[in-house]
């Protein structure tokens, strides 16, 4: 995306005028300016310079009395579903942006773009061309917190190929939207053994030491990359004027740790030589989605890392998170050796959390065609994402044998004091959430005046459930209804036919125990339940978001199998007792553990 379209040009503008403008602002270009009536085009050296040119010139620079418009040059055949939205207020919450984008159609993907500007930029993929066309018409110039959004097409290199292929878009299972393998085994949807290489080690280093890390003409950093077999990106242009700069290290876990050690040694030596600090702490950046599991229940995981490595570890507060900054800063203080050991333990936990989320996500994408966590802000956009379901840009196959449109009702229990935050001012937040998720969301009346928990009733198809519940979990964390070292775990209830409850439990509790071990959620069928007027009983699920979602989907899968068998002439002998004779399940041993792999 390094070719630029320069529009709204006065007829008096010449190629020399554009050359001078680019040179005045020190924006490099390659080749010549191709002049047409009212517009021109030119190539930039790379995507980053093209983005810099757009941010510098578009709507800001005048030539012969007219403000020029600069955007990516996109051939008509590639103006399909992909848009770039610029000038987004940096402190805007994801859910607000999601709600706005979702008004114009299904958002398949939404990724933030790293830029030098103070405002945020995202690339968005809509479900259809028409949805993208409507979004560009409605959102271009849209005023958001005194910022006028700028929206333009970006090239969809796959569009011409897709139009020549069948309804499956010519994509092979296990391949991403552009046909490139994303570290997946083709057709499997399962992460390959090299998946860890997709989790970069992100460090935050004082700006004053960046020069020493890079070295004269890049000699030092080339030496680090060569010795550690890694790729290192020093983001010098991010957050101009900031006291610290991020560094991304891409390699094996061992390669990342070796590069980290060398960088830490260089910084400490530079601090000693310049007498600027006695020691330089190690700062690791980790996406907020993983931090809760790094901390552990009551902070146990973090305390163990501190004790085992003889370090002091602190984590930045949740209040620092914004659309522009989804990462938390983990600060490690101690000797160089101790800090390096702590880095290994920290990243081990982060990678485990990532792998478990990938596993949960693969379950979701298998059961809910077209589901994309990146599109709803629940998964780090920088991570390698599992491939979309086959034929992601066309209507997906039905959800299981029962069809995709089947409505589900889930009761989610939240702290009573969180109700106001979930509803929002004049009901604005809950309305946005409902629109975004495509689900009905209602707050049930309190069971008693002093009730500590309130029931949220979520009704909608599987993907809507996933989006809505994910946002509810996220809102509670954002609003600090759970402590900084506490993972959000909620209780959800789903109703199942009394005749099918035994199948959920399994013979001797085997099914429910396997379910708990697989999902790390607590699954409880309370004893001595009396079926309601619809002959249904409640199944309780307690756990963090991914655990709860996977448990819900597995239970729904069991219920679908029961319905199939009933249609085929009876479900046979139940594998468990009648619900009135059930025994209450205790807390599973695996509740605080990672799901077992089979």
From Swiss-Prot:
Region spans: Disordered: 155-195, 561-598
Compartments where found: Nucleus; Cytoplasm; Cytoplasm, Perinuclear region; Cytoplasm, P-body
Residues carrying Phosphotyrosine: 399
Ranges that cross the membrane: none
Keyword annotations: Cell projection, Cytoplasm, mRNA transport, Nucleus, Phosphoprotein, Repeat, RNA-binding, Translation regulation, Transport
Single Gene Ontology BP annotation: regulation of translation
Function: RNA-binding factor that recruits target transcripts to cytoplasmic protein-RNA complexes (mRNPs). This transcript 'caging' into mRNPs allows mRNA transport and transient storage. It also modulates the rate and location at which target transcripts encounter the translational apparatus and shields them from endonuclease attacks or microRNA-mediated degradation. Preferentially binds to N6-methyladenosine (m6A)-containing mRNAs and increases their stability. Plays a direct role in the transport and translation of transcripts required for axonal regeneration in adult sensory neurons.
Identification of the protein by name: Insulin-like growth factor 2 mRNA-binding protein 1
Organism: Danio rerio
Source lineage: Eukaryota, Metazoa, Chordata, Craniata, Vertebrata
Gene coding for it: igf2bp1
């Amino acid at each position: 995306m390094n070719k630029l379209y320069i529009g709204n040009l006065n007829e008096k503008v010449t190629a020399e005028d554009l050359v001078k403008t680019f040179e005045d602002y020190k924006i490099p270009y390659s080749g010549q300016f191709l002049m047409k009536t009212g517009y021109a085009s030119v190539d930039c050296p790379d995507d980053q310079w093209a983005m810099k040119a757009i941010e510098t010139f578009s709507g800001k620079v005048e030539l012969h009395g007219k403000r020029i418009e600069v955007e990516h040059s996109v051939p008509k055949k590639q103006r399909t579903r992909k848009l770039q939205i610029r000038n987004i207020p940096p402190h805007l919450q994801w859910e607000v942006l999601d709600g706005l984008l979702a008004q114009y159609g299904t958002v398949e993907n939404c990724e933030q773009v790293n830029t030098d500007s103070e405002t945020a930029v995202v690339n968005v993929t809509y479900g259809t061309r028409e949805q993208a066309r409507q979004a560009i018409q409605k959102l271009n110039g849209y005023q958001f917190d005194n910022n006028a959004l700028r929206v333009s097409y970006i090239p969809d290199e796959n569009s011409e190929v897709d139009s020549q292929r069948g309804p499956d878009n010519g994509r092979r299972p296990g391949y991403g939207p552009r046909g490139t393998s994303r570290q997946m085994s083709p057709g499997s949807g399962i992460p390959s053994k090299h998946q860890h290489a997709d989790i970069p080690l992100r460090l935050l280093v004082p700006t004053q030491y960046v020069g020493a890390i890079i070295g004269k003409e890049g000699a030092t950093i080339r030496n680090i990359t060569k010795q550690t077999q890694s790729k290192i990106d020093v983001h010098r242009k991010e957050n101009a004027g900031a006291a610290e700069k991020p560094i991304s290290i891409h390699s094996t876990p061992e390669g990342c740790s070796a590069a980290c050690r060398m960088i830490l040694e260089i910084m400490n030596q530079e601090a000693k030589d310049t007498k600027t600090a006695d020691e330089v702490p190690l700062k690791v950046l980790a996406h907020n989605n993983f931090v809760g599991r790094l901390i552990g229940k009551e902070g146990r995981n973090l305390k163990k890392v501190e004790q085992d490595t003889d370090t002091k570890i602190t984590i930045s507060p949740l209040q620092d998170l914004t659309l522009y900054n989804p990462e938390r800063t983990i600060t490690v203080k101690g000797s160089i050796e101790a800090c390096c050991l702590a880095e290994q333990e920290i990243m081990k936990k982060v990678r485990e959390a990532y792998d478990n989320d990938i596993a949960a996500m693969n379950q979701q994408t298998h059961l809910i065609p077209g589901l994309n966590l990146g599109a709803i802000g629940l998964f780090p956009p920088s991570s390698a994402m599992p491939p979309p379901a086959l034929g992601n840009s066309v209507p997906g196959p039905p959800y299981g044998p029962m069809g995709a449109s089947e409505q589900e009702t889930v009761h989610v229990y939240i702290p009573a004091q969180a109700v106001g935050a979930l509803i929002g001012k004049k009901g604005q937040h809950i309305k946005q959430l409902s629109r975004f998720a495509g689900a009905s969301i209602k707050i049930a009346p309190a069971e008693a005046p002093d009730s500590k928990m309130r029931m949220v009733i979520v009704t909608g198809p599987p993907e809507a459930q996933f989006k809505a519940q994910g946002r509810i979990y996220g809102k509670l964390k954002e609003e600090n209804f759970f402590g900084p070292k506490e993972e959000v775990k909620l209780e959800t209830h789903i109703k199942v036919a009394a005749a099918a409850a035994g199948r959920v439990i399994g013979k001797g509790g085997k099914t429910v125990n396997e379910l708990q071990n697989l999902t790390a959620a607590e699954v409880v069928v309370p004893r001595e339940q009396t079926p309601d007027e619809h002959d249904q009983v409640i199944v309780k699920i307690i756990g963090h978001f991914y655990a709860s979602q996977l448990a819900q989907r597995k239970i729904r899968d069991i219920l679908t199998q029961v319905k199939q068998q009933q249609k085929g002439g009876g479900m046979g002998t139940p594998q468990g007792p009648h619900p009135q004779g059930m025994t209450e399940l205790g807390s599973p041993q695996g509740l605080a553990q990672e799901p077992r792999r089979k």
